């Protein structure tokens, strides 16, 4: 393996110990602290292609990809070159730039639901704005979200949220007023009957339904056949909006996102990660008649100092250009399918219960008998055994998400040799923890 079993992380340990006196929990996003897998987190020094190097010089095959953006591989040379050229013109204008038009046209041409788009600085910002827009357009205040679906850390969405909230075992967050979440209704993912019941109880007050079309923040959970179609029918019946949070799936499971992959067009879509090519970015878009509610075209206010900045736009444009090349998604699909199937085969060979799946460049597995169709069923995952697996994989040079409740990501940079090495590490690690 690339990294020796006697993993030396002395510099990482020292830096994280110091960081805990400087930043809450020593990190700037909770999942990075390794709380659910134990041990000290790995401090990275640099990344390139499919690999990450820590400050102690250990190299890892990376399957978090900066939590999704690095679909073309870390530090892709063409993206870096484009950014270097853009840097000579300045980092932020605080005024319109031509690059915004270019990326907006690319997004509109790619994503079926998007007729107009607004760029922001994060997925959280995009989801905050889209919720305000849902309410402004419909004149209704309630919204339905799904248990385990994560839409950023805004107050109104921290109800039965996934991602770091699930990792830390928090039902919600202190500091969120009950009045803020009173209009947030929740249903189990993949449960159309629960959604129908909520609409029956609140026929004239639900502005819409927001969901991850493929859940990635409660582990990897795909939609049941007919689930997305059912949501489209129900929302139309009640005059409510359907919103796909494609921050994770956008441009990852197909060039047009989950909506293009499954053939279901929502009214609004949120995006992020891939469209910024590794720089901070978010976006929301949809039908023109709805988007024209957004200021200054309409009365719904939303703004941002760094929104549409030239560096994020440049990285996004180049990334989408790379993704549009022939054969891109076929390669991603084949690479990820081989990895996901190999993981399950390795677990079963070790006598461990396992279930999992993949779609294009996104995958996941649970250490339990499946199938897992929602967040409640995901809790059957053996988190204690996963923690041991995570450490064993680190010692064998593979960096997995440090949580049972996060999807994994592949990239165009992952080679057949990388997958071979990863599966060998899984085989050894599963035998070790069985």
UniProtKB/Swiss-Prot annotation:
GO terms for cellular component: cytoplasm. One of its GO terms (biological process) is chlorophyll biosynthetic process. It is found in: Cytoplasm. One of its GO terms (molecular function) is pyridoxal phosphate binding. Pathway: Porphyrin-containing compound metabolism; protoporphyrin-IX biosynthesis; 5-aminolevulinate from L-glutamyl-tRNA(Glu): step 2/2; Porphyrin-containing compound metabolism; chlorophyll biosynthesis. The keyword Isomerase applies. Its main location: cytoplasm. It comes from the Bacteria. NCBIfam families: hemL, PRK00062.1. PANTHER family: GLUTAMATE-1-SEMIALDEHYDE 2,1-AMINOMUTASE, GLUTAMATE-1-SEMIALDEHYDE 2,1-AMINOMUTASE 1, CHLOROPLASTIC-RELATED. This is Glutamate-1-semialdehyde 2,1-aminomutase. It comes from Synechococcus sp. (strain RCC307). The gene is hemL.
């Amino acid at each position: 393996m690339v990294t020796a079993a006697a993993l030396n992380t002395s510099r990482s340990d020292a830096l994280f110990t110091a960081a805990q006196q400087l930043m809450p929990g020593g990190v700037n996003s909770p999942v990075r602290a390794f709380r659910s897998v134990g041990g000290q987190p790995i401090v990275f020094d640099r990344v390139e292609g499919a690999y990450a190097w820590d400050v102690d010089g250990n190299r890892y095959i990376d399957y978090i990809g900066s939590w999704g953006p690095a679909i073309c591989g870390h530090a892709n040379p063409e993206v870096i070159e484009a950014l270097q050229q853009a840097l000579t013109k300045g980092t932020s204008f605080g005024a319109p730039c031509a690059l915004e038009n270019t990326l907006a046209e690319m997004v509109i041409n790619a994503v079926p639901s998007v007729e107009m788009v607004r760029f922001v600085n994060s997925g959280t910002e995009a989801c905050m704005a889209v919720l305000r827009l849902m309410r402004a357009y419909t004149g209704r205040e309630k919204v339905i979200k799904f248990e385990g679906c994560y839409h950023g850390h805004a107050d109104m969405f921290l109800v039965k949220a996934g991602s770091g909230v699930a990792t830390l075992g928090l039902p919600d967050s202190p500091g969120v007023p009950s009045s803020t979440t009173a209009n947030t209704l929740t249903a189990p993912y993949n449960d159309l009957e629960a959604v129908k019941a909520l609409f029956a109880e609140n026929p004239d007050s639900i502005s819409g339904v927001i969901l991850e079309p493929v859940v990635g923040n409660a582990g990897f959970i795909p939609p049941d056949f007919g689930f997305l179609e059912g949501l489209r029918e129900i929302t139309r019946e009640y005059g409510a909006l359907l919103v796909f949070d494609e921050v994770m799936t956008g441009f990852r499971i197909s060039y047009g996102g989950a909506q293009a992959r499954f053939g279901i067009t929502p009214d609004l879509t949120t995006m992020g990660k891939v469209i910024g090519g590794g720089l901070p970015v978010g976006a929301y878009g949809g039908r023109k008649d709805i988007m024209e509610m957004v200021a200054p075209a309409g009365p719904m206010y939303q703004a941002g100092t760094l929104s549409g900045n030239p560096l994020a736009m440049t990285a996004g444009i180049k990334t989408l250009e790379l993704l549009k090349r022939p054969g891109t998604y076929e390669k991603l699909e084949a690479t990820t399918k081989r990895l996901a199937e190999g993981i399950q085969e390795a677990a079963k060979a070790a006598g461990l219960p396992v279930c999992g799946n993949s779609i294009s460049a996104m995958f996941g597995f649970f250490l339990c008998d499946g199938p897992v169709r929602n967040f409640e069923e995901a809790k059957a995952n053996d988190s204690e055994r996963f923690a041991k697996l995570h450490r064993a994989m680190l010692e064998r040079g593979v960096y997995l998400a440090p949580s049972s409740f996060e999807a994994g990501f592949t990239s165009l940079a992952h080679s057949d040799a990388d997958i071979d090495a990863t599966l060998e590490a899984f085989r050894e690690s599963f035998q070790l923890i069985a």
